[in-house]
Amino acid sequence: MSTPHAPTGSPLPFADLTPDAVLNAVEALGLVADGRLMALNSYENRVFMVGLDGGDSVIAKFYRPGRWTDEQILEEHQFAHDLQADEVPVVAPLALSAQHPEARVVGAHQSLGHVAGHRIAISPRRGGRAPELDDPEVLRWLGRFLARLHQTGAQGRFEHRLTLNPDTLGQSAIDHLQNSDDALPLGVRQRWLDAATEALAQAREAFDRQGPVRQVRQVRLHGDMHPGNLLWTPEGPHFVDLDDACMGPAVQDLWMLLPGDRDERRPMMDALMDGYESLAEFDWHTLALIEPLRTLRMLHHSAWLARRWADPAFPAAFPWFGTEAYWLQQVELLNQQTLVMREG
């Protein structure tokens, strides 16, 4: 079995992931592939559905080289196993076994494989459909699900993964874009920086208003709980990935599930909270962080696209990014966020 090494420092970190390389890596970690292979939608990592002898399939995730440390990934895996132990519906990574001289497996659950310069996790395949968020009973069920997730999340903490706050998501994004030579077109550069700086200042004020007396409680979160990351079956909701797990306020896992403006969201939030508070207490004061968190996500998303632009998958998927029209739209959206946050 050949094991070409991932170009860790290259803008093309997945260039070596040919179909044979993917199948070889899976077999190097103790599974027997039958040749079936399908690439799944993922930008940050590379994810494949791999068929196994016997007819089953697994999901193999190749983490972006240089993005995570072993410690950060293993905290993600431990959280998944903690949730699984508490019977919270989540797909935890499988235990692996090194079956090649160049392969090794690490972690308390032997769940992180190293093959040919790649970090790899393999999970069972679980299906489902998008949740029907216009159904109040679905929202109540999701509320109970998130309450259980956060109850488990509160029983430990991440020491190596990100803590969500205005510095880690907002200031870091502005700093990166400001220091990039070609991310911001000259004609809109200062307008965007002004809009982003003012929006971030308003987000900081909102976070500051939560403390020190009302310090925001930090728990382990899913971190990216939008409808596309949830799957629904007759048994209820589950999710299959904790790639963005972080420390932060519980409200971070709620607001992305609720589309529309504040008035449209209110009845949906009521149903979600009805389910949540049937199992756990929720700090309603932290709802004031929804618009600041939305602002931080906007800043972070722009910086994320800029950081990944050398990866050919990104220009193909986001051809509008980096244009003057894109940045002018961001200026308008950030200015709107500033007004909304000022109004409280």
Q: What is the predicted role of each segment?
A:
Residues 1-98, 234, 342-344:
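Conserved NTP-binding catalytic cores of kinases and kinase-like/nucleotidyltransferase enzymes
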Residues 41-60, 93-95, 204-254:
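Active-site acidic catalytic loop and adjacent metal/ATP-binding pocket
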Residues 132-191, 216-218, 317-318:
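A cross-family kinase active-site recognition segment
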Residues 250-281, 297-313:
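Active-site activation/catalytic loop segments of kinase-like enzymes and analogous catalytic loops
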